[in-house]
Amino acid sequence: MNQSLLSPFGDAITRVEAALTALRAGQGVLVVDDEDRENEGDLIYSAEHLTQEQMALLIRECSGIVCLCLTDERVKQLELPPMVEDNSSQYGTAFTVSIEAKVGVTTGVSAADRVTTIKAAIADDAKPSDLARPGHVYPLRAQPGGVLTRRGHTEGTIDLMKLAGLKPAGVLCEVTNVNGTMARLPEIIAFGEQHKMPVLTIEDIVCYRKSLLEKAS
């Protein structure tokens, strides 16, 4: 990762702390993974603060495949099976079956309907019968251990929510360019400046978590 491009956002610790502040305020953040991995940037919001306007931005400015990152415990609570029995995707992205709220939606695809589905899935008393399957929201199961176990956007999202003191559930979507290609770091930084969103990397989150572990030891 060309960290020099991120220098205006401070060092790794500063970038993570800026992201946590933004998430607590209900704002979005942009997270870029390793260049030798997907080399993509995701726009991430906390699920509990998610608004219809934010969902519309995800649909309009990103790939449109809006994913809901959940802990293993929440996936079990909702009884969401894996999308496939044999996951052969390159990075083992842990999609479950897609979901839809059973109450309060129409076709399920509008920004408002997708927000309703996400709020139903993260409710404290959520139960499997609250959700229809399949639907237009794509849950992702985060690995226990977060980015220290798997350096993916799914784990990065859950780690950020936990570090921010928020409900451990987040919404993400890959940022794309106007021509449909995937946005890389220069375009993601420009997107962040346009929308006043902090930019950070998975490596930043790894460094931040390791620094906390060192302080605790």
Curated annotation (Swiss-Prot):
Q: Which GO terms describe its molecular function?
A: 3,4-dihydroxy-2-butanone-4-phosphate synthase activity; magnesium ion binding; manganese ion binding
Provide the cofactor note recorded for this chain's UniProt entry: Binds 2 divalent metal cations per subunit. Magnesium or manganese.
Recorded family membership: Belongs to the DHBP synthase family.
Q: Provide the binding site for D-ribulose 5-phosphate.
A: R37, E38, D42, R150, R151, G152, H153, T154, E174
Q: Which residues take part in binding Mg(2+) 2?
A: E38, H153
Q: Mind telling me what this protein is named?
A: 3,4-dihydroxy-2-butanone 4-phosphate synthase
The annotated site for Essential for catalytic activity falls at: H136, E174
Q: Which cofactor(s) does the record list? A: Mg(2+); Mn(2+)
Q: State what this protein does.
A: Catalyzes the conversion of D-ribulose 5-phosphate to formate and 3,4-dihydroxy-2-butanone 4-phosphate.
Q: Which Gene3D superfamilies match?
A: DHBP synthase
> What catalytic activity does the UniProt entry give for this protein?
D-ribulose 5-phosphate = (2S)-2-hydroxy-3-oxobutyl phosphate + formate + H(+)
